[in-house]
């Protein structure tokens, strides 16, 4: 594992990353989802796509990368781009899972690979709506441990900065960003995904002009069992984007 210090808005971020096939010229950037880290992505794809230099990055606040700022998705994309600039590389393909899919979309790489990407606002179940309403009612009273009782599972145990960041990105509508994308997009989705349901993938694929949609068996982490198919599809469909 290596690390690189990036300065963004006068704040220093120490970013942990790992390279696979470092002698290759074409670059595949792989970004994990919220609450995850580079290791699960490397586990899936580290032994695939041998013609690419893989960059597995812990985004700020995850894995072994630091974060002491309240961020939004645009901030993450700018930090990742600064990281790539610091490495002196240009990514041909950006692959992102869940939250990482939104960040990858903003990088405007020639080829974009979305794995159950976030970015489409879903209708909250009634129970969640009640929870939110109750939280808003109790918050002004200053009751202790309210945050612990009502925080989403994806945000538990986080620092204040990461919790506020989570609130910034969790229900973010990214339809305009997907529509504006000029990348060639391959959209892979788990048919049984409940975090980013299948219909959200269909919608994203419809918004990105140059896209192909692949529904596959599995849940939010379907790619762990479909890595070979995904790698083969990337090889076939992204080759014309390689300069």
Describe these PLM feature segments:
Residues 1-28, 49-52, 90, 156, ...:
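Alpha/beta-hydrolase fold catalytic core
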Residues 148-176:
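Hydrophobic, aromatic-rich cap/lid helix
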Residues 181, 187-189:
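Short beta-strand/loop motif that positions the catalytic acidic residue
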Residues 102-141:
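Flexible "cap/lid" loop of the alpha/beta hydrolase fold
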Residues 192-196, 221:
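Acidic catalytic loop of the alpha/beta-hydrolase fold
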Residues 19-64:
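Conserved HGGG/HGGXW glycine-rich cap/lid loop of the alpha/beta-hydrolase fold
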Residues 219-231:
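Catalytic histidine-centered segment of alpha/beta-hydrolase-like enzymes
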């Amino acid at each position: 594992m290596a690390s690189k210090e990036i300065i963004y808005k006068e704040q220093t971020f120490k970013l942990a990353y790992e390279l696979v096939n470092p002698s290759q010229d074409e670059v595949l950037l792989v970004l994990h989802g919220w609450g995850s880290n580079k290791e699960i992505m490397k586990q899936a794809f580290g032994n695939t796509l041998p013609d690419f230099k893989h960059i597995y990055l812990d985004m700020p606040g995850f894995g072994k990368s630091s974060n002491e700022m309240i961020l939004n998705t645009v901030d993450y994309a700018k930090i990742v781009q600064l990281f790539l600039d610091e490495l002196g590389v240009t990514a041909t393909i950006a692959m992102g899972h869940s939250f990482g899919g939104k960040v990858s979309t903003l990088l405007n790489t020639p080829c974009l690979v979305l794995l159950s990407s976030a970015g489409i606002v879903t209708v909250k179940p009634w129970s969640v709506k009640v929870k939110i309403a109750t939280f808003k009612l109790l918050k002004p009273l200053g009751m202790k441990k309210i945050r612990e009782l009502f925080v989403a599972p994806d945000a538990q145990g986080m620092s204040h900065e990461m919790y506020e960041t989570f609130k910034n990105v969790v229900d973010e509508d990214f339809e305009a960003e997907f529509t504006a994308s000029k990348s060639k997009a391959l959209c892979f989705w788990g048919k049984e995904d409940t975090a980013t349901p299948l219909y959200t993938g269909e919608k994203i694929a419809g918004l990105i002009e140059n896209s192909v949609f692949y529904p596959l068996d599995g849940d939010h982490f379907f790619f762990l069992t479909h890595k070979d198919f995904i790698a083969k599809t990337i090889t076939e469909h992204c080759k014309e984007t390689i300069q």
